Amino acid sequence: KINGVINIIGHAGSGTHLIIDNKVHAFSNKNAISILKNSQINVYHDENEKIIRIKKVSDKYDHKIISKIDLHLPINSNIRGEIKNSDLSISKLRGTFAIKSESTDSKLTNLSGDINFNTKGGNIIANKLSGSVQLNVISGDIDIFDCSSNTITNIENGNIIINSLQGKLISNTTLGETLISNIEGDLCEININVGSLKITNCKSDLNAKIDIGN
């Protein structure tokens, strides 16, 4: 599992560019070197299968290291991974995305394909996504705008704000508020256990169920 500030950006070329910047809290240079040796981030490149693997050796000293990772990939790339604690940004890519995180604030921008994002804690901002999108959050908010995708959202504790969505929407909330505006598609299905719902300018077949709330 990787943690830190992570930026993944697509580009028109065929090459891959990776920069890892580590800042260490230590009482001496010797201690800092020891911490870095035991917290290395290994990068594996399989040219035949066209796969790049980034894996951290140990998370023992995560509380003493602040990492910044910048990864530039070809536009047509698939991403699969697990992230511990981070600020994550993914943009300008086409492919399949399967991300699991523990505590992550994420920004997904200009992505196209099959997008599946799961986080235990943290907020998700999704902008200009297309394809098939599923966003699952245990505790946090989801903000979706200017997207053309078939979208499924699942939140246990948090709010959903959607503005300008073209495509089918299925939204499930255990506890929280749902605000939707400017949606157009075959179906808009909203399920809320406890919370409130406000919809404006909906051009979809609307099916809303609220157990407790309005």
Region annotations inferred by a language model:
Residues 3-119, 123-137, 143-154, 161-172, ...:
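Acidic (Asp/Glu) and glycine-rich low-complexity loops/linkers
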